[in-house]
Amino acid sequence: MIRNSTKPAKAAPGKAKTTPKAAKSAATSSKATGTAQAVKASPAKGLGKGVIAVAPPSFRRERALIKRGIWPVAGCDEAGRGPLAGPVVAAAVVLDPKRVPKGLDDSKRLSAEKREELFEEICASAQVSVACASPERINRDNILRASLWALTRAVHALPDLPQHVFVDGRDRLATRCESEAVIGGDGLIASIAAASIIAKVTRDRLMCRLAQDCPGYGFEQHKGYGVPEHLAALARLGPSVHHRRFFAPVAAAWQKIEGAPAEPTGLTGDLFGTPADSGHAATL
């Protein structure tokens, strides 16, 4: 054990005399020290707790490109990377500069009712396309590659191929036009925010249809995410053809059962009336 060998200094013997001038000086010094300590201890005015305002997405970056003669400009985003079941749905949107819907925001910040309202407004005023990567493709390629594939297909399915596309996230797309990755883009760029709404609403509607195809899992409630109710159903019923086989909870459920599910029913591929495959794109 190491002990501190430093001893406190002993007070000088006797009682020190204090003159009125010295007492006044000491009091002033003590007051100043106390004030300095109080300032140091308390936060500066206006730096306490407060609400951080978040500006909504704007059309500013699209307009900057338009002024340079670059048009059409699209935004794209996906919904459904995290769930244990169902497809990834990607959307691409070219907004009309004269009819940018008010209230656009990251779909995760909006209520279901507001998303539905904006979905209809976006479809009525903008060029919109969607593409789905099925659970089969996700199982085969992995979730990232399947998502990028769906995003690329959505861009190429637009009525007019854009000259520039903003994509939410870190990864650029292998599109036939210039693509720009923007981290957090669904909260910054209006076109991406619109795409996030289209993707989210489309996928939610699809999961409600899959709930009819595979009752008991509660897809219409949790949309395939790994909530306790879904995990309980997965343990009780085993994986369905719409589950992503290599996601950990699904893989664990597979280990407890024998055999394999039938091939996908084609419901995912038939959403827009196109032949079933491992994914597809359509214009809304």
From Swiss-Prot:
Bias (Low complexity) ranges: 1-36
A biological-process GO annotation: mismatch repair
PANTHER family: RIBONUCLEASE H2 SUBUNIT A, RIBONUCLEASE HII
Domain named RNase H type-2: residues: 71-259
UniProt-annotated binding residues for a divalent metal cation: 77-78, 168
Cofactor note text: Manganese or magnesium. Binds 1 divalent metal ion per monomer in the absence of substrate. May bind a second metal ion after substrate binding.
Names of required cofactors: Mn(2+); Mg(2+)
Pfam families for the chain: RNase_HII (PF01351)
Catalysed reaction equations from the record: Endonucleolytic cleavage to 5'-phosphomonoester
Record's GO cellular component terms: cytoplasm; ribonuclease H2 complex
Keyword field contains Hydrolase: yes
Protein name in the entry: Ribonuclease HII
Family the UniProt entry places it in: Belongs to the RNase HII family.
CDD domains noted in UniProt: RNase_HII_bacteria_HII_like
EC annotation from Swiss-Prot or TrEMBL: 3.1.26.4
Subcellular locations according to the entry: Cytoplasm
Cited InterPro entries: RNase_HII, RNase_HII/HIII, RNase_HII/HIII_dom, RNaseH-like_sf, RNaseH_sf
